[in-house]
Structures are given as structure tokens and as C-alpha cells.
């Protein structure tokens, strides 16, 4: 049973680690989404400025190309990250299932040990009762 307790403890630790990893990945995905939103906002703001000024319009094309390339890179990174998050969630779910099976097995072993202990105690009490009954019966005959 000690090895099962150790397995449960190990799997709980693995679940904690997987949960932390998933939280880190989610936080990174949120940062990527925010950066993409910021780029879109900057592009819109610069487009408005480019419409107002000839000098700004000349540099807007280069700015737009750089920011658009940066946005595409972030979007690709976000797509890759979303796949990694999906894998991490699957691994976490599998770890939970495995932990649950170990916990169920441990619980069954504990219940079995408790039943066996109860049987041993009952056998001792039965033996004591028989001894007392014999002594009482023998005393009554004497």
C-alpha cells in the first residue's frame, strides 16, 4: 500500500506541474493576443495619421509592412501555442484519469484492510466470548 500512496503523491505532483505549465501557456497566449490587438490598433492609428499628412503617408507603407509581418509572426506563434495548449490539456486530463484510478485502487485496498482488521477483531471477541461462556458453563456445573 505504501507504493500506491507514493504513486498517488507522485501523480498529484505531476498534475500540479502540468497545471502550472498550462497556466503559463495560457498567460503567454493572452500576451500574444494582446500584442496582436496592439498592432491592429497602431496600424489603424497610423492609417488615420497617414491620411492627414503627406510625410506620414510616405512612411506608413514601411510601417505597415513591418507591423503586418510582426502580426503574422505572432498569429503563427499563437496558432502553434494553441496546439501546445491543447496537448497540455490532454496530458492533464490523462494525468487526472490516472490519478483517479490510483486513488480508487488505494481506497479499495484501505477498505479491504479495514474489513480484514474488523474480521480479526471480531474473531478475537468471539474467542473471548467462547472462553467466558465455557468458564461460566463449567462454573455452573461445579
Which sequence ranges carry the predicted segments?
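Charge-rich amphipathic alpha-helical interaction elements
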Residues: 1-142
Amino acid at each position: 500500500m505504501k507504493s500506491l500512496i507514493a504513486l498517488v503523491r507522485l501523480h498529484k505532483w505531476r498534475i500540479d506541474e502540468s497545471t502550472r505549465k498550462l497556466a503559463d501557456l495560457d498567460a503567454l497566449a493572452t500576451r500574444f493576443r494582446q500584442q496582436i490587438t496592439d498592432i491592429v490598433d497602431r496600424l489603424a492609428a497610423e492609417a488615420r495619421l497617414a491620411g492627414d499628412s503627406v510625410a506620414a503617408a510616405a512612411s506608413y507603407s514601411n510601417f505597415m509592412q513591418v507591423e503586418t509581418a510582426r502580426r503574422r509572426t505572432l498569429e503563427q506563434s499563437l496558432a502553434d501555442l494553441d496546439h501546445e495548449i491543447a496537448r497540455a490539456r490532454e496530458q492533464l486530463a490523462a494525468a487526472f484519469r490516472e490519478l483517479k484510478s490510483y486513488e480508487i485502487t488505494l481506497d479499495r485496498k484501505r477498505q479491504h484492510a479495514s474489513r480484514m482488521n474488523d474480521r480479526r477483531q471480531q474473531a478475537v471477541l468471539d474467542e473471548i466470548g467462547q472462553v467466558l461462556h465455557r468458564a461460566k458453563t463449567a462454573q455452573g456445573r461445579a
